[in-house]
Amino acid sequence: MFNHNEAILYEWVKENEPELFARIQRKVKEGKWHIMGGWYLQPDCNMPNGESIIRNISEGQRFFEKEFGVRPTTAINFDSFGHSVGLVQILNQAGYDTYVVCRPAKEQFPFREQDYLWKGLAGSEVLVHRSDENYNSVYGHVGKELEQFLEDTKDEPVSFCLLYTSDAADDLI
């Protein structure tokens, strides 16, 4: 199953490759492509104020509802350098129940668990998965990386399962 998250990237595909966009729409309907994230553009959450983040989410969700008939419930922000405690409440009010991040990296801020419940303001909470791996893979190495992922996680309970691949996927869409 494929997924991607930023509305602006889908817009560019729609404008520049309409046939590919139509194929993606079909794959979403078939359940072979999952819309996650839902932001218009993946933000850095250190500087923007809450209103900016809310508008970013609203624009992205509007696009995905119009073009695909879906509203994502998992927010993705792989490469943000900050996650304000106020973000939890914004995510909850936008309909998200899960949040996927890569930062802070385990070397910068070690947690015992990759998956945890983040409690924010006004009783809001969201299940977070912090990936300890990169969010891409080297072309041609997906099989090797998948084997390593399965070996590394064979004894761990699974609450989130994320696998990042970047090999060409023309045959799938």
PLM segments and residue spans:
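A short, hydrophobic C-terminal helix/tail in secreted or cell-surface proteins
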Residues: 167-173
